[in-house]
């Protein structure tokens, strides 16, 4: 007797991709580091596929931050065997709300099985860094003028061309604009009186 297949909800797909697909940093040809974590280029996964998984992780954490913030794509960079995807938050986040913003990202990651690697409690430039079981590194950090940035670094994967992200920003796309403008969207919750 055959069982009917059910489609997974989008968040479940993101979690399976982020946590269940074995990937990790560059290592030996066999992919073993000796500590139970895969460390080589996994067969079948290339830079484009890993970049798409990074996009899904960034999209998921942004969806987990409530109330919503407006964001735009930052630059994509590639290295010998990996990719970094970025999102820039265009909503003004006041100094009083920055820790709340970081806490929401950190809580989302903890609930979804990410391991928190470091928390920077700097008053001006706080940040949270996490890693998935499959070797993706993700972070949220506040930088110049209090702008929040989200980044996802892939583990080492097979080299390939990498296309631009396909997710539509929830505000202006700022295509071919670098550097991106500073935060310019006000929020009753996130922006406060300062910002």
Predicted features by range, described:
Residues 65-74, 112-119:
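Short secondary-structure junctions
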Residues 21-25:
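C-terminal motif of bacterial Sec signal peptides marking the signal peptidase cleavage site
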Residues 57-68, 104, 108:
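Generic non-transmembrane alpha-helical segments
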Residues 101-179:
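Extracytosolic low-complexity repeat regions of secreted or lipid-anchored proteins
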Residues 27-30:
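Bacterial signal peptide processing site
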Residues 34-48, 75-108:
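Terminal, regulation- and interaction-focused segments at domain boundaries
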Residues 1-13:
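Bacterial N-terminal signal peptides that target proteins for export
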Residues 44-63, 145-195:
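Extracellularly exposed regions in secreted/surface proteins, prominently low-complexity, repeat-rich
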């Amino acid at each position: 007797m055959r069982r009917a297949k059910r489609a997974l909800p989008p968040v479940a797909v993101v979690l399976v991709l982020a946590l269940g697909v074995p990937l990790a940093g560059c290592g030996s040809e066999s992919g073993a580091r000796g500590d139970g974590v895969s460390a080589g280029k996994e067969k079948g996964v290339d830079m484009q596929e890993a970049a798409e998984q990074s996009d899904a992780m960034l999209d998921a954490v942004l969806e987990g931050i409530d109330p919503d913030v407006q964001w735009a794509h930052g630059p994509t960079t590639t290295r010998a065997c990996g990719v970094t995807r970025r999102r820039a938050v265009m909503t003004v986040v006041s100094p009083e709300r920055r820790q709340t913003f970081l806490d929401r990202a950190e809580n989302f990651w903890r609930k979804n099985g990410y391991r928190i690697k470091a928390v920077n409690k700097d008053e001006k430039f706080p940040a949270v860094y996490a890693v998935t079981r499959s070797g993706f590194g993700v972070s949220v950090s506040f930088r110049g003028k209090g702008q929040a940035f989200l980044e996802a670094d892939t583990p080492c994967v097979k080299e390939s061309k990498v296309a631009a992200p396909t997710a539509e920003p929830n505000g202006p796309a700022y295509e071919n604009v670098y550097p991106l403008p500073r935060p310019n969207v006000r929020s009753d919750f996130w922006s406060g009186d300062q910002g």
